[in-house]
From Swiss-Prot:
Family: Belongs to the DnaA family.
Annotated Basic and acidic residues bias: 91-103
Function: Plays an essential role in the initiation and regulation of chromosomal replication. ATP-DnaA binds to the origin of replication (oriC) to initiate formation of the DNA replication initiation complex once per cell cycle. Binds the DnaA box (a 9 base pair repeat at the origin) and separates the double-stranded (ds)DNA. Forms a right-handed helical filament on oriC DNA; dsDNA binds to the exterior of the filament while single-stranded (ss)DNA is stabiized in the filament's interior.
Sequence segments annotated as region (Domain IV, binds dsDNA): 332-453
Protein's UniProt name: Chromosomal replication initiator protein DnaA
Listed PANTHER family: CHROMOSOMAL REPLICATION INITIATOR PROTEIN DNAA (PTHR30050:SF2)
Broad class of the protein's primary localization: cytoplasm
A GO molecular-function descriptor: DNA replication origin binding
Entry domain remark: Domain I is involved in oligomerization and binding regulators, domain II is flexibile and of varying length in different bacteria, domain III forms the AAA+ region, while domain IV binds dsDNA.
GO cellular component: cytoplasm; plasma membrane
Annotated region (Disordered), positions in chain: 91-113
Length: 453
């Protein structure tokens, strides 16, 4: 596979996994280019020093993971600008340094702060009504591992601060106990390492790595659904850590009861401690997040421009910060002062003005009803024939995915059904989608149609 083919594949994955703002701002061609692969390093050419610094801080691990998904081999990215390439030796030295600095996958990373983003601390976390309780719980766990809440299970949508809190816990524990053994990983990395340990006959080393620690922080646990062997291994890892008084912190995009194809014994253990959810930030919190980001960037932006960003991007902190970074980058590259007009111009490809119509449950029922030939009134009726009940479950699933309405409110819009019925419908459709690619595509097409109304 050529460098161009590899990078095309990485960009295709990035487009699916990153937010539209992040992808179009930093990676959309021709903003990045894979120019060389040396030992364990991918040399990636970017446009400017500003972009280089930002990608190094925010995207090194993400791009490494995407490269591994694309080609099956983990390469650490080294972001370079044209000036770095004046002498080929510079690139080679850089690649060598990167390779030598990279720890072996089985080597203990337990007490290394390199696992954590230096910016993701409790001090930089902006507290608001939607995250106050998760922040307090995370701080309590960091101050007294395995004494407060064990496990701590944090769930919420993409880009709301779950990973920030997990990194903050790691930083705090290590700052207060340099001998502590802390591992932060994702369920996907855990799975990949487990598979590799079986293939290489190194399961004992794998278990030593994950069980001889003080704190385990595991992100995106929902991705172990359907992975029976991984669930079995994680079950025993969980038990070993919990029984020996070690702290476990887990994050997910949904609560344990809504993770389909998860063993009941694992679901039960996830519910042993404290479950907290992070919700989208309100206007005041969004403004505070933008102000905090400005302090980090040491940039002044007119209040009107900040207000514009906060009003246009409401549900995702990552997209909110990405929008601000895009505006700053656009201003610097255009050599223009930041104004409301420039802000709107910088974000015109990302947000719609006037603001997009908010999706309602009635919108969802209308689209699903038209597709499956179900009358609107039948969504609220007591009829249980499959030709009506199944489209009703699909509409409930989409209502949970595409709106911010509570479970009781969704149930109310479907004839006063109980919130447990909504949960069951969501899990049922989620399971069916995971088992049937054609049905999954069908539901995704419905979602696109609803969003594009």
């Amino acid at each position: 596979m050529s460098k161009e083919e590899i990078w095309d594949k990485v960009l295709e994955l990035a487009k699916n996994e990153l937010t539209p703002i992040s992808y179009s701002t930093w990676f959309e061609p021709p903003k990045t280019e894979l120019i060389d692969i040396q030992e364990n390093t991918a040399i990636i050419l970017v446009e400017s020093n500003f972009v280089q610094d930002f990608l190094k801080k925010q995207y090194t691990d993400i791009i490494a993971d995407l490269i591994e998904k694309a080609i099956g081999t983990k390469l650490m990215p080294n972001f370079v600008i044209q000036e770095d390439l004046t002498e080929d030796k510079q690139v080679k030295d850089s690649a060598k340094a990167k390779s030598e600095a990279k720890p072996d996958v089985q080597a203990p990373q337990n007490s290394s702060e390199d696992q954590f983003n230096v910016h993701n601390t409790f001090e930089t976390f902006v507290i608001g009504p939607g995250n106050r309780f998760p922040h307090a719980a995370s701080l309590a766990v960091a101050e007294a591992p395995a004494k407060a809440y064990n496990p701590l299970f944090i769930y919420g949508g993409v880009g709301l601060g779950k990973t920030h809190l997990m990194h903050a816990i790691g930083h705090y524990v290590l700052e207060n106990n340099r001998d502590a053994k802390v591992i932060y990983t994702s369920s996907e990395k855990f799975t990949n390492e487990f598979i590799k340990s079986i293939r290489d006959n190194e399961t004992e080393q794998f278990r030593e790595k994950y069980r001889n620690i003080d704190v385990l922080l595991i992100d995106d646990i929902q991705f172990i659904q359907n992975k029976e062997q991984t669930q079995e291994e994680f079950f025993h890892t969980f038990n070993d850590l919990h029984q020996t008084g070690k702290q476990i912190v887990i994050s997910s995009d949904r609560p344990p009861k809504e993770i389909a194809k998860l063993e009941d014994r694992l679901r039960s253990r996830f519910e042993w401690g404290l479950i907290v959810d992070i919700t989208p930030p309100d206007y005041e919190t969004r403004m505070a997040i933008l102000q905090k980001k400005l302090e980090e960037e040491d940039v002044d932006i007119p209040l009107e421009s900040l207000t514009y960003i906060a009003n246009q991007i409401q549900s995702n902190i990552r997209e909110l910060e990405g929008a601000l970074t895009r505006v700053i980058a656009y201003s610097r590259l255009q050599n223009e002062a930041i104004t409301t007009e420039l802000t709107a111009e910088a974000l015109k490809d990302i947000i719609q003005t006037p603001k997009s119509k908010k999706i309602t449950i009635q919108d969802i029922q209308k689209v699903v009803g038209q597709y499956y030939n179900v009358r609107l009134e039948d969504f609220a009726a007591k009829k249980r024939t499959k030709s009506i009940a199944y489209p009703r479950q699909i509409a409930m699933y989409l209502s949970r995915e595409l709106t911010d309405f509570s479970l009781p409110k969704i149930g109310e819009e479907f004839g006063g059904r109980d919130h447990t019925t909504v949960i069951h419908a969501h899990m049922k459709i989620q399971t069916d989608m995971s088992e049937d690619p054609i049905f999954k595509q069908e539901v995704e097409n419905l979602e696109k149609e609803i969003r594009n109304q």
